[in-house]
Each structure stands twice: as structure tokens, then as C-alpha cells.
Amino acid sequence: MKTINTRRSIRKYTDAPVSEKLLRRLLSEAERTQTMRNLQLYSVVVTRSEEQKRRLAPAHYNQPMVEEAPVVLTFCADYRRTTLWAKNRNADPGYDNMLSFQNAATDALLFCQTFCNLAEEEGLGCCFLGTTVYMPQMIIDVLQLPELVVPVATITLGWPDEQPALTDRLPLDAIMHEETYADYTPERIDRFYAEKEALEENREFVRLNGKQTLAQVYTDCRYTRKDNEAMSAGLLEVLKKQGFLR
């Protein structure tokens, strides 16, 4: 992939449309990604209408790109199609459980990432919205998702109208382990995060939030224990309602 070393999240798009032909080709090509037992345990809901984007926006904290992007794609863990196929072929499906959700979520995220790679090769811009699993029930209601279908990722898609700077990444040694997992000593943590913490934009981020360290911004402001626990409870409730937990 020629674009992987320059990829960035794009949140602003031109008014140029993404053609149906191009979108269908990219989604079709993305189907070649890895999938458990060749079952393709995913679906994608394509949203183009202004009304539907307006209804989806609150589930993503009203981030502007949801309504401004030409296309919004919601990728779903989907065991419904496989379950109905089994029932219609005199088979007894047993996919209303946590393992099945995990398998379907993995399939859906692989499909999503492969699609993003292909789209960026075509010059399109994408932004991955992690908010999909924060308030999934709202998305389920808007998209009318049936039992055994759960949204796990959302992508806004369009032709870029910005060229943001590349974001930093940890060094390879921070994430790569040889043969067994090498746990992190304080010294290794210091070394791996030194460059990130020294970036001027991150130092300003700490100052604006009135914190002592960058880590505190993440734990105290952006991804708090209270929010994580509340959204975890909400996600578990959705898995029950959608038939993956009994």
C-alpha cells in the first residue's frame, strides 16, 4: 500500500460526490479480506441522505463530519444472515453468545479496515468514529438493525478538503514482543513515551486541560473511568437486546 505511511484522518470533505459505482467496487474488493470460516460475519449500512445523517449525528456526539461527509458507513457485526441461512437449510445455529459476537466483530473490523485502505488508495479520505460503541442503541434504532446485528464501527467518507499533519506513533519496540511478552518497566515506559510527551501540541494539550501529565488528560478528561463503566454497561445491555447475551 503506497499510502499507508502518509495516511491521516480526514474530517473535512469537498462537495464532490462519491459515486455509487466507486463505492460498490471498493466494498466488493474489501470482501476479499480475512473472515472466519468464510462466513463474512458483517454487514455495512450506507448512509447518504441528509435526514439519516442528521439522525445519526447525536450518536456520534454531533461531530460535524457525520453530517458534512458525502457518505457515512456503519459496519456491523452480523450473525443474523448466517443464522437465517442455517435455519432455512435445516441446520441448528448456536450463535446467540459472546464468542459469536467476538467473531463477528472481528470480521466486521477487518472488513472496515480493508475498505479504508482501498478507499485511501483511490484518494478518498476517511475518519474512523470510535463513538459507534459508545451509544450503539441510538444507531440500532436509526438504522433499524435486527437481532444478532450490532454496529461496531463508523466511517465518514469523501474527497479530502484538508491535509492535516501526520500524527505521531510509538516506536516499533513499544508494541513488538519477541517470542514472549516483555512487560514494561518504568524505564521502558519513559523511553517509549518521551517523544509523544515532548511534542509541542501535546504539551499545550496538557496545559489547556490544567493537568500535570499527558496521561492525566486521557484518564481524567477524555476517557474517564466513570464514562468507560457507564458505556460498558450500555454495550452489555445492547448485546443482550440484540441476542448475543442471554
Name what the model sees in each region:
Residues 1-246:
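Acidic, surface-exposed loops and disordered segments
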